[in-house]
Amino acid sequence: MTVKYIRGDLFTHSAPTGKSIVLAHACNTGGSWGGGIAAVFARKYPKANRQYSEYCHKNSHLLGTSLLLKADDYDKSKAYIACLFTSDFNQSPEQIVKYTDQSLQELAKQLKSLPIETQNGNQVVNMPKINSGIFGVPWENTEAVLDKLDSLDFNVYVID
């Protein structure tokens, strides 16, 4: 497991030949990509946004789970969008961190059979500093979850 920090735009990450990439973000369970990085996902991937919203409205008990969607431009980008259900806006930062751990463990299982890019022998998940915006979780708390996951490596994109 490695957490690597990259200065730049998450959406410029490109797939190695023959592989797909994962762009992950923390999501609410209400079906709204309305603010923060989620709003950027909604503008960039309106079809995936509709799929996410429909999924949320048809399902319950989503906290601690993940939803993997193909990006609208999957044929070109080979990008999957990982929706990590970490909050419904009623959780403490500690609860959000717990749900982050659970959702990433589920994501790791979902990715096992897919041709996802690797580094250091692990599949890679690309993300911003999840939970640290609207959900208000100190980044160090989420980072601790990433550090202990043995099955995935993380590229965390930061913008100055």
UniProtKB/Swiss-Prot annotation:
It catalyses: ADP-alpha-D-ribose 1''-phosphate + H2O = ADP-D-ribose + phosphate. Substrate binds at residues 8-10, 26-28, 33-38, 130-136. The keyword Electron transport does not apply. Keywords: Hydrolase, Protein phosphatase. One of its GO terms (biological process) is peptidyl-glutamate ADP-deribosylation. InterPro entries: ADP-ribose_metab_enzymes, Macro_dom, Macro_dom-like. It is an enzyme of class 3 (hydrolase). GO terms for molecular function: ADP-ribosyl-[dinitrogen reductase] hydrolase activity; phosphoprotein phosphatase activity. Its EC number is 3.1.3.84, 3.2.2.-. Residues 1-160 form the Macro domain. Gene3D superfamilies: Leucine Aminopeptidase, subunit E, domain 1. Disulfide bonds: none annotated. Belongs to the POA1 family. Highly specific phosphatase involved in the metabolism of ADP-ribose 1''-phosphate (Appr1p) which is produced as a consequence of tRNA splicing. Removes ADP-ribose from glutamate residues in proteins bearing a single ADP-ribose moiety. Inactive towards proteins bearing poly-ADP-ribose. This is ADP-ribose 1''-phosphate phosphatase. It comes from Lodderomyces elongisporus (strain ATCC 11503 / CBS 2605 / JCM 1781 / NBRC 1676 / NRRL YB-4239) (Yeast). The gene is POA1.
